[in-house]
């Protein structure tokens, strides 16, 4: 392209990031460099910024001075948006508003009046400085009034928000009065969520403290009641049988689910016909194998054993019921033996304190311990019966009447 073709006019829209000036439309040519554009802006821009203090940004890219506009700007765009950023060494002066002019006029009139009446009244330096500060900050107060204005209903509902943030700027200061601080949530909703969160946290903390205090109190009570049981009178002890009956009649341990409810066992429900067919088919296969590959007597023995196991699981033959019924008397005897042993220990301690202990008590204790030792046959029979009865599966627990 020849030199004459380079003289193509282009329109730039200069935007200031501080929004002190409106968007300025600048006409230039594509063969201009960035440095030449800065020189042109120093002459035509309202703040007259220096060339060395200007920074031009286009499409998020900082433009160096040696590049030409034809290499930077997009050809398909009619208008090109360029951001002008000035360094802090020579910040652009803010435009003078009408309020500033009025304030300066008021200051001039007050100064003239003070000079006219200087012979009668002489104002103090503090009053002059106060008037100057008030006059200079008039425009600033006029500009920042819409930002500091808040909703009167919100300020009435939440006065502590205004009082607690007098010296601190919060995000809602620069928002118009009709626009909420957070568009999606109102302050009342956020305050309610914070209150609910604090309440839930406090409830969990109280539950944890209560559980810890209950466990420590129960352990301390158990430790305090244990020495009292050793020093009680034998005749005043209540019978232990009701305690055992209450434990047997107590609710069973229910297995809980992960979601909080009890675990539902599928075997507790009624079986359908498909389950029964599957069970009978397995039994038929087992019996057919035993019948065809064994003798008739073994087949009868296997059938009888299976029937016995089934009746035991159904609750017809509870093998361990006798032991369960004798458990309470055995516990009573064990408690009585423990009480007798405690009484013997107390008696021995009293005899040792009195100095009346002799060797006859030791011989009698050895004879009693030797008489209580089971024999060899009794131990063997107990081992065999316990081993074979443990092979039989336990039936459902018996319901106490």
Swiss-Prot record:
Domain annotation Ubiquitin-like: ranges: 10-89
Protein name: Homocysteine-responsive endoplasmic reticulum-resident ubiquitin-like domain member 2 protein
Cellular localisation: Membrane
GO biological process: endoplasmic reticulum unfolded protein response; spermatogenesis
GO CC, one annotated term: membrane
Keywords carried by this UniProt record: Membrane, Transmembrane, Transmembrane helix, Unfolded protein response
Pfam families listed in its UniProt record: ubiquitin (PF00240)
Main location class: membrane
Entries under PROSITE patterns matching the protein: UBIQUITIN_2 (PS50053)
Ubl conjugation recorded as keyword: no
Positions of the UniProt region annotated as Disordered: 87-137
Compositional bias (Low complexity): 88-98, 109-126
Function: Could be involved in the unfolded protein response (UPR) pathway.
TM segment ranges: 299-319
InterPro entries: HERPUD1/2 (IPR039751), Ubiquitin-like_dom (IPR000626), Ubiquitin-like_domsf (IPR029071)
Taxonomic path: Eukaryota, Metazoa, Chordata, Craniata, Vertebrata
């Amino acid at each position: 392209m020849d030199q004459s073709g380079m003289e193509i006019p282009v329109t730039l829209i200069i935007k200031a990031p501080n929004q002190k000036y409106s968007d300025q439309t600048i006409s230039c040519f594509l063969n201009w460099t960035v440095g030449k554009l800065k020189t042109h802006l120093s002459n035509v821009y309202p703040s007259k910024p220096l060339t060395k203090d200007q920074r031009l940004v286009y499409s998020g890219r900082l433009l160096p001075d040696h590049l030409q506009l034809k290499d930077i700007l997009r050809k398909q765009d009619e208008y090109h948006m360029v951001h002008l950023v000035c360094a802090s060494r020579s910040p652009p002066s803010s435009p003078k508003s009408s309020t500033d002019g009025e304030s300066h006029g008021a200051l001039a009139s007050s100064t003239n009046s003070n000079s006219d009446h200087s012979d009668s009244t002489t104002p103090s330096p503090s009053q002059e400085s106060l008037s100057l500060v008030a006059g200079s900050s008039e425009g600033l107060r006029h500009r920042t009034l819409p930002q500091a204005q808040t909703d009167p209903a919100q300020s009435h509902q939440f006065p502590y928000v205004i009082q607690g943030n007098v010296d601190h700027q919060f995000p809602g200061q620069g928002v118009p009065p009709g626009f909420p601080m957070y568009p999606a949530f109102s302050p009342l909703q956020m305050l309610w969520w914070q209150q609910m969160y604090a309440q839930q946290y406090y409830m969990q903390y109280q539950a944890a403290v209560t559980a810890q205090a209950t466990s420590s109190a129960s352990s301390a009570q158990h430790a305090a009641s244990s020495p009292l049981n050793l020093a009680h009178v034998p005749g005043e002890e209540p019978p232990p049988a009701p305690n055992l009956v209450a434990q047997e009649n107590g609710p069973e341990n229910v297995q809980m689910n992960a979601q909080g409810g009890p675990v539902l066992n599928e075997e507790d429900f009624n079986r359908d016909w498909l389950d029964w067919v599957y069970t009978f088919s397995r039994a038929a296969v087992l019996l057919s194998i035993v019948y065809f590959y064994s003798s008739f007597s073994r087949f009868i023995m296997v059938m009888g054993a299976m029937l016995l196991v089934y009746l035991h699981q159904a609750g017809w033959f509870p093998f361990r019921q006798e032991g369960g019924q004798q458990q309470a008397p055995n516990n009573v005897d064990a408690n009585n033996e423990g009480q007798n042993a405690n009484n013997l220990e107390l008696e021995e301690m009293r005899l040792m304190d009195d100095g009346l202990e002799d060797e006859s008590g030791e011989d009698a204790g050895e004879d009693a311990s030797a008489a209580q030792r089971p024999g060899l046959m009794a131990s063997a029979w107990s081992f065999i019966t316990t081993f074979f009865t443990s092979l039989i599966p336990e039936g459902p627990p018996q319901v106490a009447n």
